[in-house]
Amino acid sequence: MLNVKQEKGFQYVDEGNGPTLMLLHGLFGALSNWEAVVNRFSSQYRVVIPMLPIYTMPIKEAGLEGLRSFVEDFVATIGLDNMVIMGNSLGGHVALLYALHNPTKVSR
């Protein structure tokens, strides 16, 4: 079972130590989609998974740019840097946009 943290308006998983691996879930996903990945990689990586506010953001803000902005705010709030970012489905698209707009924050 994943330990979900709540801090400064964000819900997220933050487990393990080592280089940071940030995972973004898809449109119909949630934090639990990544549980097996957390179990496998948290011994080697700091695995961070924010809960994307797909259904709680105002509809006009819930597009790709709004979600990218949310991820930027999340990264700044918890102080992430030099991370590997990846996602599945919609989360993969948001991860790509984040990396393109913030190349100094990602290692791959």
Question: Which stretches of residues belong to each language-model region?
Answer:
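N-terminal cap/lid segment of alpha/beta-hydrolase-fold proteins
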Residues: 1-9
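Soluble or luminal CAZymes and related metallo-dependent hydrolases
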Residues: 4, 29, 63-67
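Active-site acidic short loop of glycosyltransferases
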Residues: 7, 16-18, 43, 76-82, ...
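Conserved HGGG/HGGXW glycine-rich cap/lid loop of the alpha/beta-hydrolase fold
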Residues: 8-57
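Short Gly/charged-rich anion-binding patches and loops
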Residues: 36, 70, 94
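Active-site loop/oxyanion-hole signature of alpha/beta-hydrolase fold enzymes
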Residues: 39, 48-86
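Conserved hydrolase catalytic core segment
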Residues: 81-108
